[in-house]
Amino acid sequence: MNTDARLCAMREQWDPEADAFRCYFTGIALTEEPGDRRSITWEHLDPRDGSRVVLAAALINRMKADLTEEQFRGMVKALADHFEHPEEPFDETAWPPGPARPEPSPPA
């Protein structure tokens, strides 16, 4: 766990007017209610890099799964485009390559 990265994210995402943290991806105010889709969770922008963490709504965290931030944004955009124009084929270039889970790093 990278404590400095977490403290930095907390400072950057705190909204004193809302008295709440804001979701990195959506900007919505996060809750501390267990089971709420807006509940606060930690999200790794890159699953292989523990130094790049943000606070995200539980629902968004589940949607992102093991994708990098770039892969997630590309997939969401491709889905939105396909929802808007269902007659058009899905942009398969947005589909993330490789295995569904990142390979564990070899021991140092």
Give a label for each model feature.
Residues 1-4, 99-108:
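A boundary/linker detector
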Residues 1-22:
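Short, charged surface segments at domain edges that flank catalytic/cofactor-binding sites
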Residues 46-54, 62-104:
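Polybasic, low-complexity binding patches
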Residues 22-58, 64:
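Histidine-centered nuclease catalytic patch
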Residues 3-6, 57, 68:
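Helix N-cap and loop-to-helix transition residues
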